[in-house]
């Protein structure tokens, strides 16, 4: 049984002798020793999958189909041959492998983690995975989020260059309250950034980026803040329960953490404007 501590949840992974390549970011979160907090057990098993893998709904080559089986959602992955793959059951947090199948090459542990629906284990505990650049500024976390291509990595790197910050994760962070205070946690997936540090920090602010000719910052009203957080939260859009949980978590975060809108250029002044706001010089916008 492999053990990883992610977002204050001890993930216990039983791979059922399925060969895994265990070199990657997930190993940064390995855990040894006792744990008295939340646990999630990922169980893998070998069982026939012909009824699902033979479906014409699944095209060829490393793609998946979404089904409902006995009122449980089911994701089926396969390799070329429709009778060669595995199924992920998000509701029960388990994975079914076709008996006797041989993975050539073996599964990459990081990729397997990314598709095993761990985000749901966070959502049911009032936590979430947020698509954002996670930056450590003096021992506190600031997250830059927004649409793809808006400049999350650019703003994070500007803070590194001009404010002595450090990027903890270039693409994702776990958000969860600890003793009533929201924190940002490291996460094993980091997109194409290549930056993945296992670090937990108190959360100071979430910054929603947009591009513009002038650098301006304001606190977003509650509705806009919740919409921005929800659009950046990882959940299956076809799963109503996950949407409901994600909405609840976004509402809780917006009620306790400043969610700021930063219209910005990719320059040092964008850092200065946001830094001044965060330090309290002009952060008295009505919410």
Question: Language-model features: where?
Answer:
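Hydrophobic positions on the alpha1 helix immediately C-terminal to the Walker A/P-loop
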Residues: 155
């Amino acid at each position: 049984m492999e053990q990883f501590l992610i977002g204050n949840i001890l993930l216990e992974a039983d791979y059922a002798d399925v060969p895994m390549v265990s070199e990657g970011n997930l190993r940064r979160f390995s855990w040894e020793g006792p744990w008295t907090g939340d646990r999630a057990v990922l169980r893998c098993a070998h069982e026939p999958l012909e009824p699902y893998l033979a479906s014409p709904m699944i095209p060829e080559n490393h793609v998946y189909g979404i089904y409902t089986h006995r009122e449980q959602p089911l994701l089926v992955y396969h390799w070329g041959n429709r009778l060669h793959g595995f199924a992920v059951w998000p509701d029960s947090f388990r994975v079914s492998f076709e008996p006797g199948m041989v993975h050539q090459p073996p599964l990459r542990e990081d990729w397997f983690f990314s598709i095993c629906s761990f985000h749901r284990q966070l959502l049911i505990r009032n936590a979430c995975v947020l698509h954002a650049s996670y930056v450590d500024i003096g021992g506190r976390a600031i997250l830059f989020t927004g649409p793809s291509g808006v400049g999350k990595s650019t703003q994070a790197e500007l803070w590194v260059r001009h404010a002595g910050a450090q990027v903890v994760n270039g693409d994702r962070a776990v958000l969860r309250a600890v003793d009533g205070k929201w924190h940002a946690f490291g996460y094993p997936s980091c997109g194409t950034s290549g930056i993945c540090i296992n670090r937990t920090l108190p959360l100071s602010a979430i910054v929603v980026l947009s591009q513009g000719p002038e650098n301006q910052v304001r606190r977003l009203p509650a509705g806009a803040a919740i919409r921005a957080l929800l659009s950046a939260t990882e959940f299956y859009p076809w799963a109503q329960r996950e949407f409901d949980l994600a909405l609840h978590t976004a509402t809780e975060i917006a009620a306790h953490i400043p969610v700021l809108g930063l219209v910005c250029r990719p320059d040092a002044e964008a850092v200065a404007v946001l830094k001044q706001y965060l330090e309290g010089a002009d952060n008295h916008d009505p919410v």
